[in-house]
From Swiss-Prot:
Crosslinked positions (Glycyl lysine isopeptide (Lys-Gly) (interchain with G-Cter in SUMO1)): 38
Reaction catalysis annotation: Na(+)(in) = Na(+)(out)
II repeats: 741-1013
Stretches of the chain found on the membrane's Cytoplasmic side: 1-129, 177-190, 232-250, 423-759, 810-823, 864-879, 983-1209, 1260-1273, 1320-1336, 1470-1532, 1581-1592, 1641-1659, 1776-2005
Ranges where the IQ domain occurs: 1905-1934
Region (Disordered), start-end ranges: 28-61, 494-529, 591-634, 1120-1166, 1933-2005
Protein name, entry field: Sodium channel protein type 2 subunit alpha
Organism of provenance: Rattus norvegicus
InterPro entries in UniProt: Ion_trans_dom, IQ_motif_EF-hand-BS, Na_channel_asu, Na_chnl_inactivation_gate, Na_trans_assoc_dom, Na_trans_cytopl, VGCC_Ca_Na, Volt_channel_dom_sf
Subcellular location, record wording: Cell membrane
Glycosylated sites: 212, 285, 291, 297, 303, 308, 340, 1368, 1382, 1393
Amino acid sequence: MARSVLVPPGPDSFRFFTRESLAAIEQRIAEEKAKRPKQERKDEDDENGPKPNSDLEAGKSLPFIYGDIPPEMVSEPLEDLDPYYINKKTFIVLNKGKAISRFSATSALYILTPFNPIRKLAIKILVHSLFNVLIMCTILTNCVFMTMSNPPDWTKNVEYTFTGIYTFESLIKILARGFCLEDFTFLRNPWNWLDFTVITFAYVTEFVNLGNVSALRTFRVLRALKTISVIPGLKTIVGALIQSVKKLSDVMILTVFCLSVFALIGLQLFMGNLRNKCLQWPPDNSTFEINITSFFNNSLDWNGTAFNRTVNMFNWDEYIEDKSHFYFLEGQNDALLCGNSSDAGQCPEGYICVKAGRNPNYGYTSFDTFSWAFLSLFRLMTQDFWENLYQLTLRAAGKTYMIFFVLVIFLGSFYLINLILAVVAMAYEEQNQATLEEAEQKEAEFQQMLEQLKKQQEEAQAAAAAASAESRDFSGAGGIGVFSESSSVASKLSSKSEKELKNRRKKKKQKEQAGEEEKEDAVRKSASEDSIRKKGFQFSLEGSRLTYEKRFSSPHQSLLSIRGSLFSPRRNSRASLFNFKGRVKDIGSENDFADDEHSTFEDNDSRRDSLFVPHRHGERRPSNVSQASRASRGIPTLPMNGKMHSAVDCNGVVSLVGGPSALTSPVGQLLPEGTTTETEIRKRRSSSYHVSMDLLEDPSRQRAMSMASILTNTMEELEESRQKCPPCWYKFANMCLIWDCCKPWLKVKHVVNLVVMDPFVDLAITICIVLNTLFMAMEHYPMTEQFSSVLSVGNLVFTGIFTAEMFLKIIAMDPYYYFQEGWNIFDGFIVSLSLMELGLANVEGLSVLRSFRLLRVFKLAKSWPTLNMLIKIIGNSVGALGNLTLVLAIIVFIFAVVGMQLFGKSYKECVCKISNDCELPRWHMHHFFHSFLIVFRVLCGEWIETMWDCMEVAGQTMCLTVFMMVMVIGNLVVLNLFLALLLSSFSSDNLAATDDDNEMNNLQIAVGRMQKGIDFVKRKIREFIQKAFVRKQKALDEIKPLEDLNNKKDSCISNHTTIEIGKDLNYLKDGNGTTSGIGSSVEKYVVDESDYMSFINNPSLTVTVPIALGESDFENLNTEEFSSESDMEESKEKLNATSSSEGSTVDIGAPAEGEQPEAEPEESLEPEACFTEDCVRKFKCCQISIEEGKGKLWWNLRKTCYKIVEHNWFETFIVFMILLSSGALAFEDIYIEQRKTIKTMLEYADKVFTYIFILEMLLKWVAYGFQMYFTNAWCWLDFLIVDVSLVSLTANALGYSELGAIKSLRTLRALRPLRALSRFEGMRVVVNALLGAIPSIMNVLLVCLIFWLIFSIMGVNLFAGKFYHCINYTTGEMFDVSVVNNYSECQALIESNQTARWKNVKVNFDNVGLGYLSLLQVATFKGWMDIMYAAVDSRNVELQPKYEDNLYMYLYFVIFIIFGSFFTLNLFIGVIIDNFNQQKKKFGGQDIFMTEEQKKYYNAMKKLGSKKPQKPIPRPANKFQGMVFDFVTKQVFDISIMILICLNMVTMMVETDDQSQEMTNILYWINLVFIVLFTGECVLKLISLRHYYFTIGWNIFDFVVVILSIVGMFLAELIEKYFVSPTLFRVIRLARIGRILRLIKGAKGIRTLLFALMMSLPALFNIGLLLFLVMFIYAIFGMSNFAYVKREVGIDDMFNFETFGNSMICLFQITTSAGWDGLLAPILNSGPPDCDPEKDHPGSSVKGDCGNPSVGIFFFVSYIIISFLVVVNMYIAVILENFSVATEESAEPLSEDDFEMFYEVWEKFDPDATQFIEFCKLSDFAAALDPPLLIAKPNKVQLIAMDLPMVSGDRIHCLDILFAFTKRVLGESGEMDALRIQMEERFMASNPSKVSYEPITTTLKRKQEEVSAIVIQRAYRRYLLKQKVKKVSSIYKKDKGKEDEGTPIKEDIITDKLNENSTPEKTDVTPSTTSPPSYDSVTKPEKEKFEKDKSEKEDKGKDIRESKK
């Protein structure tokens, strides 16, 4: 890192780039070359080589550390600052804006050296900021010209001008940079390629005549892309997009693969089906019938000639081709489809079903060839208009094929689309991580640079200290402030411009300067975030001491303690320099400005852990601070050295804590004790600010300032921002905007202030807002006179109230302060608009102003946290995603222009192909606006219909390409955009408790006061009654303590973030810790001074207060842990356990100890008490003795019942009954009347079921007792459902069955299946998860409703009553405006008995409710076209609509779709996913959608790779078999099989519907060849692998496929000859597709994704079950309500609610919200002439075919919300989860594949699969592995050091080796332990045998033993020698002593080693001499494992231990 500091920062680092510099560079390069030998040069670009400094990249701004550029150096060549380029030929140029441009120092175009004046000039022009502006303007103007559809002639010259400017730009760039050879030249930048191509094309089209010019002209559109290259922020975004596309490669491959497979299936199943049409029987003709029959019999080979040559008068071909002979439904372009199978669509009387004519939708919807099938499948996957495809296919092929669609929708659509989502989300996450890390690294580098400045700073320090001593007033109440703004940068993607920051700063300055005049009355109770920042230093007096006390001990840290304030404001790049946090996960959290070492508070990972910040006791904390404002904090300024901080000690003395100088001479001033008012504090704060400013301007300061350039910058920044407003403005503001002229006025002001600022007034205003909203929502059409007058009066009143509120507030606060606050500005804006609107009420066309009143709704946000949050999220996202949105806009623009240029003319010329009356349809590309609308519609996911039109007029290939590009690119960007939105500005932290953390807002205070008042009255009444009646002291005594408690609670509302005392009481604390002022009752609660002292004296103290949400009582004080750093870790762990219960008030302990997360009641064999204790206490009769008499009998009865109820057979029986009774409901369709026997059976069954359920209920009552029964929610559900049955039974018995109420009750029987919920574990789990999410879903739903309300009211204002039109009701056509202009003319027609009718559109905006429905249709993109057409055509009330008269009303819908649909629906997805993640955390990270059983399956899947070493399949002894074996096991064999599979797939794709006989035969033989080949493969493998063949899963799969293929061939022959069942035949052919699936085996990426799917299956199964249950209930409900509805629009003979099957088919379609508008439309018919209420239905007593609009709307809306939002999103949540798990698994350093490899190698060394290997072979084994596990030779030492346990025979177990090797790869870590435990579990599961081998020793011990043995041997030899030589015995004794000393030491080592390895509880293991240590003791790591299901293993361990003892 030091390399980046080579160039000294500061102004002296800039040097001109001269010839000498160039020479020096050349010399360095030469030296470098000479130094290095040739080979090394190749590895030059190695990863570990030096990298360019990312801060000095071209295009970035110069970092602040370099200070200002001397003016003479601007735009001049300078030497490169980046050390990386020290030996590269480059130089840099800086412009005025300090942007870095880097150029190559070689000659440009071989002639211009860097010193050439021409090149210098070019460079000056290029880097000038205006140059970019010019190009930008040119591009934009050019874009405007491009949007013209028929440009006039003079535009040609304009074109030339543009081309000229672009050419000039490129020339400048080429002159300045060079063309293409060196780095940093023109063509080295990909963005310049774009320019180059654009210009070349411009010239080419000009001078060369190329024919189709319009196609080439479209290339000009790419100029719009140049905007991207000009705006710096966009480049990064585009980079990000490209990154995420790269990431998508795997998913794309999988998607294409799956779609191909499904398309092949579709091809086989539905080939040619969609051409079946209903043909009219020809004129009566006997020969025809013969022909027809022969036609059907020979249908496979008819050639189109007439069949019967004898009859030539009838030409079948011509007859079929004539369209008029087909059956058309009215209004349809395509003939009615039909099918020949029993469950397909039938033809009307007189028609037969024949395959003829073209396919539907211009012939583009079909499965006839692979390509069309693929398109259809792609359409299914993107779910665009798929209901149409679904209905056509089911009609033509039969309802059974619904299964195909279910599979494709669930596996294809939901799964694949969401996988794309998951991948994109992950790409984003990774990018965010990367930017964070980069920022961290930068901070470290800067820290080093700052150290270089240390010396300069120290000099400045002395001067500063002296200066501070001169100025007495320098000290302030809380530091002098440069106010940091890090909250604005808190959003991950935010790149707010410095301008904004400066403006904010400017506001603050004004505030501060005016602050001197601020008077006491201007106390504001509720301030927004902004004003909080303005209030300056949020830390309290003591807090500041705490923060800065230890700071000066290490001088170089001081500067960075102000982490973001110095550097961030001027940077424009995405991650501002210091805006990140080191170890804290949440960006922008509490201690951004504390040093890492001396962090004020321990960094806690959870944001909810509140901080203990003692607050200044004179200052009320402003109320409405939201989450973000915590991140915005005040920062004390740095006088020159940045080291002087002021602190206030406990006596109120302000001292300057600076370097030693400041400490030794503490200059301070006593704050007056207890008298300072809040205002004075504030005043003092602002005045001190002035002092600091004057101080800085003092001339004597200048020298010191020049010492450290960094500070110069900061100060300049201050002065600049201060001078933004000239001083005269402040004078003016003080004079005119602050009103405090005379005493009486001040008194008035004071009174007004008291009134306006009172919480009750706030409450009243809020109520007014709600009422006003209601009034606006009550408008409807048609309204009576009185009603509208009431509304207008109401509006006047509300306008008056709001105006009054505004004026009073202005009086109370002074205009200056009033407009300092965001909400007030907002109010002011709305009030002035309302007044304006009153003035302009009579002017036509300004009714739009009325919709501005709607913005008042947003005032609710002030007191409604979730709404506030939503607005913030949208605000943040719009800001943060500004760049992305821009990219999207550019893309939309480009495609709109391309569409217009390419297809505009064709639409005009070929319009008759797509429109009956040869008028341009609504969706065309002839003009730019319409082209834009089409592109927008494609982005909404509706591309297929417009594409058909396009293909019809402009040719298939071009249209397909353009539309697919828009679809993929646009949708990817949109998806990216909203994902980024959700990821960056949305986490449930802000959802759950936005405002809990801050002081209660005024509403809560007001409500609290009311509550208090009510309590007080209640208490007084109670006391009075007790005094009057019960004159007992005791009663009073009982009340007293409670009362006290209440008082305490009320008087002190503690708060999460800070412990603030006495909020309402505004008292002050004087120096001695007593309280003066109001509220002595609070004295007990004042935190004692000593607490603060402990803070101050021990800065390392931290307090963590874990809190449960939503509780704000003082009890939180008891949970604090005052702890020093030493026990911090522990409390952190505790916290992580407790704070995980976010969102609930109950802490669920970590489930680690083995208890289930849901604590179920203990299974006791005794029933519980019948009644609750309270009941027993009040009614003595409830208490029965169970010891004797009747009581005992009763008790025994209960015990018996309990046994019955608890028996699992009982439960099974009940479940069976529930299923039967639910099944019975499915039979009650419209045909039940005709099937009398079934009807009577059902009636009896119904009674039986009811009795059984009543019996069950009674049994449970007796067994469980009422208390237990009625406290269980599931029991309540049972109870209510049984009640319904009971009531209807009694009603039937009494003969009231025909009553309306009873009938509607009967429909409630549809809820019966709900009882199955509690019985099926899987569904119950999901429902619990859902219920957990309901609060936050409801919250967001409410917010969305408010949001939509605005659009709805706006819609009512714009369109109410304007959708009426006059139609001819026989033809259904609308009269033209020329014929009928208005209502009265229509009436005239009606009266003259014409067939006319004045009719409304069914879904309209006549009132707010219908408005909501319309908006829902628009948001789900279903039925939105009709609504939009009506809106666009509308003129005025009672006027006949005119085609596209009101064209720009489209924009209303576009805006709604963006905000109402994209934002709010995505927000839902965000909330749901987030919620489930939170619940998951709460349940200890397990999946909340799985039952225990399924979790086991899931874990098994996860551990799939854990295989035990298998015996390799032995090579057969037989010579022939051996040869085959060798051939089959070669890799070539596998690869060739794969190639064959691919070829087979291709041949299957070639098949088409209308292929010739010849082709069919060829394909038949090819297929035969493939079958033979695959059978051959199968046989070869069987020969060589013998019975082992079936041990491998894939082989079994292959085998089955081969068998099916062979059987299929024979069956196909049989079926063709004997049976005519084409479906069966087709299904059998599908078997061939199975072969393709074998490809999966080969592709790793696809395997990962499918693995993720496999892992999601259990959870998805549960969710699927729940979805089925919901569908079932709704189907039955639909059958009982809508069975007889008129068949029109979406309801017809196949898709209706008449039978259970049909209902399910319809509901499945709506699950994806497809086509629900069509099903709803007929149900909205409420009376004639739309439907006939008296119509008879044969065979049924029901009359009429009208629907019930209210029931229908409720039915569909609720179903859509439940299924679409909930289920689909749960699906998403599960997939995202498992996808990340699967990718993590594949991304870990050791994947399953590595373990497989380990075992494969193992098999060679351990052929008998003993699981052990001899120690001598270990070295070879380690060398034989592949990396990363490989340990190359020489590896003996490493292996010995691994200390592996050995068993007798010097053998080592494979697991131990694997552990040791993985440890080597992963390093020591917690993960390692987890992995080890996991592997051991897997192993134990598969090999119980392992335990029996007891290790005796380890490799290390073995080595030590060997060494010891050698030592002993040597000693003994020496001893013998000594004996022989007969030396003096004393020497011998000495020697002996040495040996004795030696051995014990060795033994100690061994013992230590053993203990080190053994687990804590087994430390009593004795040295190895007594008995072999247990296997566990040698292998287990230090950390104890807590696996509950491994109890048997533990027991074994215990036995071993006991035997040792």
